[in-house]
Amino acid sequence: MIRDLEYYDSPILRKVAAPIDEITDELRQLVLDMSETMTFYKGVGLAAPQVGHSVALFIMGVEKELDDGELIFCDFPKVFINPVITQKSEQLVYGNEGCLSIPGLRGEVARPDKITVTAKNLDGQPFSMTLEGFLARIVMHETDHLHGVLYIDRMSDKDKTKQFKNNLEKIRRKYSILRGL
């Protein structure tokens, strides 16, 4: 089932997500729904708070990035439960980011080029991955969602132009009206 997205200015996007203690049938269904939702909206990652669930879970739909920048998508997304970024490279790389919860806007964000993340999969088994480049960026972006942080919070002030701020305000107003606020 395709879930409704939470958009910029939704309070759930600013909450710290609760850890997941148990893998339940409801959690498995949430992951299936998130996968359908991410595919429908053409995302590369999706965090549970973006579909209204403040739990420490995200999915990533990209398996690898080729040398020419082409993305290879997974048949079924990688599931990260209670993810923790345990290592980050000191080298920062700027990259252009967008977010399904902030439609139509993109911004330059500096992030470590290489990370190691530990998490549990949908079977409750712990795993660790070292990622670099775009895949590392996806994991950091989605992990930020679980801490109530949006990519716009990581943009430098000089990149938040007046036009960018005006567009952000338009998004806030549009989706506040749709939520009935």
Curated annotation (Swiss-Prot):
GO terms for biological process: co-translational protein modification; translation. The active site is at E142. The gene is def. Belongs to the polypeptide deformylase family. Its cofactor is Fe(2+). It catalyses: N-terminal N-formyl-L-methionyl-[peptide] + H2O = N-terminal L-methionyl-[peptide] + formate. This is Peptide deformylase. InterPro entries: Peptide_deformylase, Peptide_deformylase_sf. It is an enzyme of class 3 (hydrolase). Keywords: Hydrolase, Iron, Metal-binding, Protein biosynthesis. GO terms for molecular function: metal ion binding; peptide deformylase activity. Fe cation binds at C99, H141, H145. The keyword Protein biosynthesis applies. Its EC number is 3.5.1.88. Removes the formyl group from the N-terminal Met of newly synthesized proteins. Requires at least a dipeptide for an efficient rate of reaction. N-terminal L-methionine is a prerequisite for activity but the enzyme has broad specificity at other positions. Binds 1 Fe(2+) ion.
